[in-house]
Amino acid sequence: MFLLYEYDIFWAFLIISSAIPVLAFFISGVLSPIRKGPEKLSSYESGIEPIGDAWLQFRIRYYMFALVFVVFDVETVFLYPWAMSFDVLGVSAFIEAFIFVLILILGLVYAWRKGALEWS
């Protein structure tokens, strides 16, 4: 029971940091005026009226490029701490990182063979 007193500051911080955004959204929702009109329903593109249908569907190629980018971005996030502590971790960490990079390279080769990286 006495060990729970060590976490009082943590719980207070968690409650306050959760309450502030909730209160901000609630207060802005209550106090903001709601005006519906044709300007609110029209799409806005750099101050120019759009020509044609404003709701265009993106091609799947954009999503595939974004997905491949995210995978290799996450790889960088995981490999940076490993590279900074390489001399401390030893050979087993090197083998694990090598297997990790090998799996990602196999995924890249698979995406390349399936044509996910081609822009045509």
Curated annotation (Swiss-Prot):
UniProt keyword terms in alphabetical order: Chloroplast, Membrane, NAD, NADP, Plastid, Plastoquinone, Quinone, Thylakoid, Translocase, Transmembrane, Transmembrane helix, Transport
EC category: translocase
Annotated Pfam families: Oxidored_q4 (PF00507)
InterPro entries the record matches: NAD(P)H_OxRDtase_bac/plastid, NADH_UbQ/plastoQ_OxRdtase_su3, NDAH_ubi_oxred_su3_sf
Location(s), subcellular: Plastid, Chloroplast thylakoid membrane
Gene Ontology CC terms: chloroplast thylakoid membrane; NADH dehydrogenase complex
GO MF: NADH dehydrogenase (ubiquinone) activity; quinone binding
Segments passing through the bilayer: 9-29, 64-84, 88-108
Function: NDH shuttles electrons from NAD(P)H:plastoquinone, via FMN and iron-sulfur (Fe-S) centers, to quinones in the photosynthetic chain and possibly in a chloroplast respiratory chain. The immediate electron acceptor for the enzyme in this species is believed to be plastoquinone. Couples the redox reaction to proton translocation, and thus conserves the redox energy in a proton gradient.
Name of the protein: NAD(P)H-quinone oxidoreductase subunit 3, chloroplastic
Originating species: Barbarea verna
Classification of source organism: Eukaryota, Viridiplantae, Streptophyta, Embryophyta, Tracheophyta
